[in-house]
């Protein structure tokens, strides 16, 4: 009997609370998102994907990070202006990673 250790990764999701439209991406190692430029780029990609579906200007948004291996998920309510601010966007992602990884260590 072999034991497989398949990493299902971490799912970063941007959700429009009013319509449930979403954009998402899986990362096998979320630590890459600790790099501010990478986090900012990924948030911008998710934002642009969601913008192609709906007008985000007056929408309530939620940024979520889920560990697909154990189901632990944390989210943060946000506004489009925060997501478009590189410092704020990278800080939000870092905070979500720290919380999810904290549960991983318990």
Language-model regions, residue ranges each:
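Charged, amphipathic alpha-helical segments
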Residues: 1, 33-54, 87-106
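Eukaryotic multi-domain/regulatory proteins enriched in long, charged, Gly/Pro-rich low-complexity regions
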Residues: 2-4, 13, 18, 74, ...
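Negatively charged, low-complexity tracts enriched in Asp/Glu with abundant Ser/Thr
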Residues: 3-48
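Sterically constrained small-residue positions within well-ordered secondary structures
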Residues: 3-5, 54-56, 67
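A short, structured beta-strand/loop element
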Residues: 12-14, 57-74
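Generic detector of low-complexity/intrinsically disordered segments
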Residues: 13-16, 52, 63, 85
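Short, compact, well-ordered microdomains
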Residues: 66-98
């Amino acid at each position: 009997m072999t034991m497989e250790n398949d990493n299902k990764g971490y799912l970063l999701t941007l959700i429009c609370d009013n319509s449930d439209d979403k954009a998402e991406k899986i990362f096998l190692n979320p630590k890459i998102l600790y790099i501010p430029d990478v986090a900012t780029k990924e948030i911008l990609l998710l934002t642009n994907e969601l913008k192609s579906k709906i007008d985000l200007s007056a929408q309530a948004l939620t940024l979520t990070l889920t560990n697909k291996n154990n189901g632990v998920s944390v989210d943060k309510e946000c506004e489009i202006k925060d997501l478009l601010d590189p410092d704020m966007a990278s800080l939000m992602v870092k905070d979500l990673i720290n919380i999810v990884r904290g549960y991983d260590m318990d």
